[in-house]
Structure formats: C-alpha cells, structure tokens
Regions:
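Extracellular acidic, Ser/Thr/Pro-rich low-complexity tracts
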Residues: 318, 875-877
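N-terminal beta1-alpha1-beta2 submodule of the flavodoxin-like/Rossmannoid cofactor-binding fold
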Residues: 872
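Glycoside hydrolase catalytic-domain context in secreted enzymes
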Residues: 1-404, 420-868, 884-929, 936-953
C-alpha cells in the first residue's frame, strides 16, 4: 500500500485526511502495471529474456521516441518525462547495446525529426523509418547476439486507424527493415509500441523469434519494456482482443467507417464471440492468449452449482524454471435455444500471485448464471423484453485463453427461466438483418444465418409525456444553503424550491474549457457557476481529461499512465485499483473532482482510433476494469466519469454517423460494461457520446439515460454531454442548441459554454420552459442529480472549509507551474502611455504556435490597470479540435483560452491581464496543441477601475 489515510466522513465533515503522494512509488507502480500488461505472443528458442552481457542491436526509430499514449483528449497529459527503450536499456545495464548502430540512428534523426503533425487529429499514425539495407543489418549482426526491432503506431480522437500502410499495416520501409534484420540475425525480437492490435501477417513472412506487444505504457513505458525484455518482470499479460488473420475477417469491418450510417449487422457476435462461433480458422492469436518465460500446469479441482451461483476451483502450478504469474479464464457456452448464442462468453477470471518454480496456488472463479441471461428483443422465447435463461446445458470451460479452455463442468436447466423483466428501450427504427448461428450436427462451428432485427413497437413520445414530472414549486429564497442539506437540516427537494427557473437553467450548463473558476487548464467547471447559484452555497466542481492521466492545458504536469488496452491485458483488477488509488491522490491534490475516464467503449473493430483508451472487445472484462479504477479513485473522495455512453465505436464523422444496432446487442454488448461499472464500481458520473444511436443523439436519448440507466439500473448520479455535443428531437437533425431533449432525458449538464449566466451558446432550454415543452419539475430533477453529485464531492468540503487535508509529497519530479519550456524572448517592448482601448501591436514574426512551444514577450507597463490581450486567429481544423493557449505573467498563470477548429474562419479571443504594479513583466504564451494560425495579437488598456481594491486582488 502506498499511502496512509486517516480520517472519516461524519455528519458531512471530513475531519482530517492525511496522505502521502510518493511520486517514486507512483512511478514504480505504473512501471509494474505497464510490464504486467505486456503480452508475449511468440518466443522461439527461448530468445527472451535477454541474458546478462548479451550484445544487442536495436532497430527502429521508436526506440528513441516512445509513444506514451494515443492522441486527442485521452493523451494530452503533460508528463514530466517519458522513458524510451534505448535509454532504458542502457540505464538498466544488463545487456550491451550496439552503440555504433545507435549513433547511426541519432545522426539520421537530426535530419528527420519527429513529425508532430499539423495539430488536433492531424498527427501521423507513424513516423518515417530509417532505411536499413542488408549491408547495415549484416554489419550489426556481426557485432551482436540479438536484434530488437521497435515498431510504433498512434491514433486517437477524431482520427481512426486505417487498413493502410503506416497504420494497421506495416510500411514498405518497415517490411524491408524486418526482412533484412530477420535474415541477418539468428535471434530477432519485435517490440510493438502501439495503442491497439495491428496486422500480424508479417510474423509468418519473416519468422522473428520473439514478438512482444508493450502497447502504450505511459511515461514509464520504456523502462517497463526493458523489465520484460531482461526478465526482471516475467510477462503475464493476456490479449484483451482477438487478433485475426486479416482485417477483413472481423465481421464489423464491412460496415466500419461509413460517414452516415453504421449497421451493427454482426449483432452480439463481437470479437471472440464471432470467431469462436463462426470462424475459428481465421484466428491468428486468440482472446486471452499470452506466453510466459515459464510454464504452468492448470487443473480444475472442483466445480459446483448452487442455484445460479457457479464456482470453479483451479490449481495452478509453476512447472518451469523461473517465477511468474498465470491467469485462469472461465468461459460459458450457453444452449443455442431459440435466440442463438455465441459458443464462448467470458464469465470469470483470476490471476495468481507470483509463483516460484514448483509453487502452487488455488484460484477461486465465481460467477452467476443470471449474469449471462440472453435478452429477448423479439418475443421468440415467449418473454419479450426479458432477460431469459433458455433450457439446456450451460457448459463451462476453463483455461488460459479462449481457444485452449477445456470443459470444467456444467449446469442444466430443464425449463426456461426469466431472470429480469424490463421494458423495450432503444430498439432500432430502420430495417436491417443481423447475424445468427446455424449449426449442422456434425460441425463444431456455425454457418452464418440472417434474421430481421426487431424494430421499435413503443410510442417513445407518449412514454416521455406520461413519465415526465410536473410538480415543482418556486418558493423564493428561504435562506437555506446546500450545506443545510449536507448536515441533514432540510431535504434536497426543499432546498431546490428556492432556485428560480433561471438558476435551474444555468445549472444545466458547464463552463470551459479551461475555466478560471477551477483548476487551471482543466476541461470544465460545473455546479455553482453563476453568482445566483453561488448565493445558495452551491460549490463549483472541476473535471479533467482523461483515460491516460490528468490533462491540464496550461502546461501543468501530471503522471502519464498506461493506456486502457494495456490495463485490460493485465487481467488484474486489484493491481489496476491500486494504481488508480495513486491517480485519486493526484486528482485530489489538484482539486479535480472527476476524471473524464475511464473510456469503456467496446473494441468493435481494430480500426477505431480511440481503442487505446478503451479496454477490450469483451464487456465483462471492460466493466471489471472500469469498476477497479472507480474503486481506487473513490478511496480519496474523487471519481471517474465513465464514457462514452454508448456506441462510440468510430471516430470518423462521430458527431453525426448513426449507429444502427439491435436492442439485444446494445444490452448484451455495448451497455453491459457501463452496467457493471454502475452496479459494481459505484459509478456516479457518466458522459454521453457525440453521435446518434438508432436515430437519436445519445445526449438527448430518453430511453438510454432515463429508461435504462436510471429506472432499470437504479443509477444515482450525473450525466454530462461530450464537449459541444448535439441533441435532437426524433426525426430532426442534431444541434448543439437543442437542449430541450437533453434536459428531458436527464442528461444533466451541457458541456461546455463560455458563460452559463448569459447563455453564451444560445441553447433553447428557456424557450422550451416557456412554451411547455419542458417543465420546471424536469429542470429540478436535473438539478437534484447535480446537487447529489456535489454533496458527495470534495468540492463541497472545499467550499465550506471543512476539508482539513494534509498531503505530503515525496520525490516530486512534477512542475506545478506548467508551460513547458521557458520559451524564447521574441520581443522587448516598452509600451507607450496607454489610451483607453487603443491597440498596441505585438510582433508575430518569430512566433511559433506548434504544440509544446512557449513564446515570451518582455513588456514594460507604464501604469497599473486592466489590460486586454487580444488574439485574432484561425485554424483549418474541424470544429471539435481543441487548441489551448495559456497566458502567464512572470510565470503566474493568468488564463487558458481554447480555440476550436474554425475551418479557416478568423475568430477573436480576449485574456484580461491585471497589472498591479507598473514596470517590467514577462508575458509567456504556451501552446498546448498545434494547428493555430495567428493573424494578429495586440494589447489594449481597459482602465484602472477601483485602484485600491484592484491592488488587493
């Protein structure tokens, strides 16, 4: 355990919390996680681990430029350092690096620097590779015992992968590199520094002796990789996705990437559910597969069924020569019945501690049969809109991957059993067909059959009208504060009667990005964002991206953590929970109430750009890992916002592409991970997606956010939109102004607007209240959800000064001042005696707006007062691009402004600079993302105001 916590929550007061944020232990834990999530796919001739003193040549430019994460909001963590592979190998000292080859690369890199791209979603998937001809490969082989080839890839938000060279496929130069190195060396190790799986046909072509996926391991990823290569850590990661022979073998590929409609014709047969049922011969590496440097023997000691509770006991023995860990996986084969089922579903898993040679451990694998009831969306079982266990044998298989799992036992039902009765929700309205298995008796796999997908039969508008609350009276200000609710003096319902309609409307708006009301550089502020709301003692909560660590666009640094795919490959929720305890401490230290993560969308297709953020193709593994993160963060009073609810399985045209999917597939696959996170992880903050599902944008989808989430699952928490999302009335196009369906659906907060009080985004909530499309009671219901979140947040304690907290920091490499490098002084200007609102131009000749750069202006201010720094700028990027600029005076952050992509239109942004003392100041600009074209920048004097109060600010 890496922290000491004392204190308790009593009568709404945290008496004292003491904790130690030891950054060295944080790094050690992140490094361990990154190593344990690495997956060894091939290890011929015991090529790995490398032996002490071995001479090794390292190829591939990514050895120098480690990908810590993917791109976009999930990857924009300002890490204090990122370890790479080559330096970590030399730091480790176990093997001898071919320094002559290293120098060849370093000289080449001087002429071929890292290409950061043109800005948001414009980063290249890969970097240009140094050509390696036969002569260089043979020369290096003569000086070495083994070769390591490092291949790197990235992708991310707004930028899917592509079934093209340099993305899912290798480039011609990478093919040449592998061909020449594998031919010249007796032992070649390929290391894949990638966010998600890539095409693996090259393994057959070049036959490298070892292949290791290290994913994107955060800032400690380089060291973690070396730990595995040298055997300090025995790899124990297991694939969280199936690797097929070809991208076309995935059933979703046919419909992936359409800009308008994406039909989920594969239905519930995603990943291994499809391959184990229909196409076993198309699998190159099965789900759950991963090698070790040792060997294990697994046997089932016991299997029992009591009611619907299923228990298996597995005995694992290390029969090899080195210490290691093993994961036992329990799979279910349900009877086909009338609905049709996949031949395998992951039902449970457990991982051993580190076992020395000869040691044994017994693992307990438990599950509930009811968790794997099938949803009948057609009524074919006689139980429409019910979760049903059909009669027959439920056979369980145990093993170390889905393909090798052997029968462990079975449960038999002699008649169908209805597990849960619900109500039809989110059924599609467009006709299409879905996959269903058909079996010949003599075959162990199905052939594809197709059936019509059941369409919606309920009147959604009528449901919304009948269920809408109508009673909510305005009582005026009674003098109550939200603290009175916390202390049990009044009910929350009473408290909310004081809020005017305008107050309630304002509470539905989050402010950002980079609101000055909360931690600098974060994603949004929400809650008491107006003076009217603050008057009632409503605190302002802070949220920040994201799944790979804390993003603060002002340049403040934070720990960059291993990506979601890697975390899932550990198959170790306890270890992930421990890591996210540390993340919880870091969030609390930075006064951030919720992290915008984990991302828990399903890996429907390997080409989704944000797969690096997400966990797996399997919903049970996904939900289990999400619950572990939430539990870890929750130990420090903070939480995560699980996202994107739901079906964010494609980045291309994600704002508008309609996901058309059956109700059964939604419930069994795409919503299931969220359900586990809510019920087992205690989630109380959720983010909806950008796009529509079955014609309704999720940000205003009543059946998603009320019928299923709140009524069926019993969810008590907030829902927020994704940033600048659209909503719609059924049959109408989506619009960011259309907040009426958002409020009606209990999506509580629109993210984000510049100013909640003035309705700067021009939403139509007030219009809907005036004409009866909304009721005050609906707004009150949303306010109750928001206040419920705030009442359990540390933001509430901060507002009341009840948070007595003692944080000790050890071994801190992180600068809290932010803004990257110190920056180049571009100009030294003595400003003229200012005239009110007169423009004072700042030169742009040497200004660089590339990601991570800083620019400094040395300015002499002749008088105190308020000055306005005005940017006139544009970007050719799309409207969802996020391009932050942070402005510092004498290294003190003044404000961070965010420009969205303008598609070439010139816009103006203004930052107020309070000059409390005349004289010389250093004004620094920090650009957090590339893509801004600066057309003009100037200062103007805005007056002194009340000088005495101004001096005391």
């Amino acid at each position: 355990m890496m922290s000491t916590i004392t204190g308790c929550l009593q009568e709404g007061v945290i008496e004292r919390m003491k904790y130690t944020l030891d950054y060295q232990k944080y790094a050690e834990l992140a490094r361990r996680v990154a190593a344990e999530g690495s997956v060894l796919l091939r290890n011929e001739e015991n090529t790995l681990p490398l032996r002490r003193g071995q001479r090794v040549s390292v190829f591939g430019r990514t050895q120098f430029e480690h990908y810590k994460s993917g791109t976009g909001s999930g990857g924009m963590v300002n890490a204090p350092y990122v370890t790479n592979i080559i330096d970590s190998l030399k730091e480790d000292g176990i093997i001898q690096v071919n320094e002559a080859l290293e120098q060849v690369y370093r000289e080449w890199l001087k002429e071929h620097p890292f290409d950061v791209g043109e800005g948001w979603a414009m980063e290249p998937w890969n970097q240009e590779e140094m050509p390696v001809d036969e002569e260089l490969a043979v020369q290096a082989a003569g000086q070495s015992d083994a070769a390591i080839v490092v291949i790197g890839r990235t992708a991310g938000e707004d930028k899917d992968n592509s079934a093209a060279e340099g993305s899912y496929l290798l480039t011609a130069l990478e093919e040449e590199l592998l061909r020449n190195v594998c031919h010249a060396f007796e032992h070649t190790i390929v290391v894949l520094n990638v966010g998600n799986i890539i095409d693996m046909k090259w393994v057959d072509r070049y036959q490298p002796q070892a292949v290791l996926y290290i994913w994107q391991g955060g800032q400690e990823g380089g060291r973690a990789c070396v730990d595995v290569l040298t055997g300090r850590v025995n790899p124990s990661g297991k694939l969280s996705d199936t690797i097929a022979e070809d991208i076309e073998d995935y059933p979703s590929t046919e419909n992936f990437g359409d800009p308008v409609e994406n039909f989920y014709t594969e239905d519930i047969y995603v990943g291994y559910r499809y391959f184990e049922t229909f196409a076993k011969d198309k699998v190159k590496y099965p789900f759950g597969f991963g090698l070790s440097y040792t060997k294990f023997q697994t046997e089932i000691l016991g299997f029992s069924v009591q009611g619907t509770a299923v228990t298996a006991i597995a005995k694992v023995t290390n029969v090899g020569g080195v210490s290691g860990r093993e994961t036992v996986q329990l799979y279910l084969e349900a009877p086909q019945g009338k609905l049709g089922k996949p031949l395998r579903q992951l039902a449970a898993f457990a991982k051993t501690e580190e076992l020395k040679p000869g040691e044994t451990e017994e693992l307990l694998l438990k599950t509930e049969l009811t968790e794997y009831a099938s949803y009948d969306d057609s009524g074919v079982t006689g139980h429409k809109s019910c979760y049903v266990l059909e009669e027959g044998d439920y056979i369980f298989y145990a093993g170390t991957d889905v393909r090798s799992a052997a029968e462990a036992g079975k449960a038999t039902l002699t008649e169908p059993r209805v597990v849960r009765m619900v109500t039809e929700a989110m059924a599609p309205v467009q006709e299409f067909k879905r996959l269903k298995p058909f079996f010949f008796e003599e075959k162990d796999h199905a052939i594809a059959n197709w059936e019509d997908v059941p369409l919606r039969t309920i009147d959604l508008a009528d449901r919304i009208l009948k269920e809408r609350p109508t009673k909510s009276e305005y009582a005026g200000d009674r003098g109550w504060k939200l603290a009175d609710v916390l202390d049990g003096k009044i009910a929350l319902e009473q408290f909310l009667t004081q809020l005017s309609d305008e107050d309630l409307i304002c509470m539905t708006r989050g402010e950002g990005m980079c609101s000055p009301k909360v931690t600098p550089g974060t994603a949004a502020a929400f809650g008491g964002v107006t003076e009217g709301l603050k008057r009632f003692g409503i605190p302002i909560a802070c949220c920040s991206d994201g799944p790979s660590g804390i993003r603060m666009d002002c340049g403040t640094m934070a720990y960059a953590l291993p990506n979601g795919t890697l975390l899932a490959c550990t198959f170790d929720p306890e270890l992930v929970e421990e890591l996210y305890e540390m993340e919880g401490m870091e969030l609390r230290k930075n006064k951030i109430d919720t992290l915008l993560g984990p991302g828990i969308n399903i890996h429907r297709n390997p080409l989704n750009g944000r797969n690096f953020e997400y966990f797996s193709e399997d919903p049970y593994l996904t939900g289990t890992m999400a619950a572990a993160q939430l539990t870890g963060m929750g130990k420090y009073g903070v939480t995560g916002t699980i996202k994107h609810f739901a079906c964010n399985n494609q980045e291309f045209k994600r704002h508008d592409a309609n996901s058309i999917v059956s109700e059964r597939a939604l419930r069994e696959i795409y919503l299931r991970g969220f359900e586990i996170a809510v019920k087992q992880g205690g989630a109380y903050s959720i983010m909806s997606t950008y796009g529509p599902v079955n014609g309704l944008w999720t940000a205003g989808n009543y059946d998603l956010l009320t019928t299923i989430l709140r009524k069926e699952w019993g969810y008590q928490g907030i829902v927020m939109t994704d940033w600048w999302a659209k909503m719609n009335e059924e049959g109408e196009p989506g619009s960011g102004r259309q907040t009426i369906p958002m409020v009606r659906a209990q999506n509580d907060i629109y993210m984000v607007v510049a100013d909640a009080a003035s309705n700067s985004a021009g939403d139509n909530t007030a219009e809907g209240l005036a004409d009866g499309r909304l009721t005050r009671a609906q707004l009150t219901r949303n306010a109750e959800n928001i206040c419920g979140f705030l009442l359990r947040s540390v933001a509430m304690e901060r507002l009341l000064d009840r948070e007595e907290e003692e944080c000790t920091e050890l071994h801190n490499p992180i600068s809290t001042e932010g803004a990257g490098d110190s920056g180049q002084v571009l100009a030294r200007l003595e400003l003229p005696e200012p005239k009110l609102l007169e423009d004072i131009e700042l030169p742009l000749e040497k200004l660089s707006t590339k990601k991570g750069t800083s620019a400094v202006y040395q300015l002499r201010f002749p008088k105190i007062g308020r000055y306005e720094l005005v940017f006139r700028m544009s970007s050719t990027l799309g409207e969802l691009a996020q391009l932050p600029i942070s402005v510092f005076l004498n290294n003190t952050l003044q404000q961070t402004v965010t420009l969205n992509g303008t598609e070439g239109q010139i816009l103006e942004r203004v930052v107020t600079l309070p000059i409390r003392q005349d004289g010389e100041k250093y004004m620094k600009l920090y650009f957090g993302e590339s893509g801004i074209d600066m057309h003009r920048m100037f200062l103007r004097y805005a007056g002194q105001n009340d000088i005495e109060s101004f001096r005391n600010e």
